[in-house]
Amino acid sequence: MGAKTGLLVYADGDVPGLLRRVGAADLDRTATMMRQLYPGREIEQREGSNLGDGVYPPEGTVCAASWPGVEVIGDQEVMIDAPSRLPEHLVAASTGRRLVLHAMHSVVDWLAFAVWEDGRLVRSLSLSPDSGIIENIGEPLPFELPYWAGDRPADIIPWPGEEEEPYALPFHPLELGEDALRALCGFIQEGRPEPDDVDADAIELYGFHVRDPYGPGPAEQEAKLRRAVEDTDPPRFYALSPDGSLVERDGL
């Protein structure tokens, strides 16, 4: 699975229903929202994206759109281990409406989602196989129940040379993550789409470069990235064998 999200949605009601009815977002309205949600930051418009891709924009980029009744923000900064610690000003902006946070990263099988109603946290879950359950606040939502009941166990293929071991969680976080994204926002990243899913690729988001004026500059960030790449081991490639196991191979 290659799904990654860092998503906030503010809404006056049911998010999927509202997103099904949106048209082109107003740029001035969206820019005003950005200034409210990113106080003290330098904000510069750049190339946008669609909702399907904009839920995980490049670092330092925010993809966003504001319509009457619903606002969408895609930003890696909201991918936090404990959703209950979302910055207070972001939660305060949800007064009188619903706020949904959805974040997942396929590399580490991590999922986090949360729901606030009128500024009050009603549900938060964050978990990964390496860290276990990081946060679990409130009662499980209906789409979660089959997972906690053991009806959706993780189906994991072991790496070559490793014995199959029980998965560290009773279900796969990314599978729950897709169901959470559909239930809370109306669309998915991976998997089989359903007829009434929101067409995320048809919803356009504006792009913004967001920078802390007191943070590292572009040259320093590029140097840091270059050092990280140099320290990374070369990639290894695997393919499925006829018996369903993984076999290492040379290159793609």
Q: Which residues does each predicted region cover?
A:
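Short, intrinsically disordered low-complexity segments
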Residues: 29-126
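Short loop/turn segments at secondary-structure transitions that flank enzyme active sites
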Residues: 14-16, 79, 130-131
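Long, compositionally biased intrinsically disordered terminal regions
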Residues: 104, 110, 118-252
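Surface-exposed polar/charged interaction patches
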Residues: 25, 96, 187-191
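Short, extreme N-terminal segment that most often corresponds to the first beta-strand
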Residues: 1-33, 249-252
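Alpha-helix boundary/interfacial micro-motifs
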Residues: 23, 28-29, 85-86, 136-137
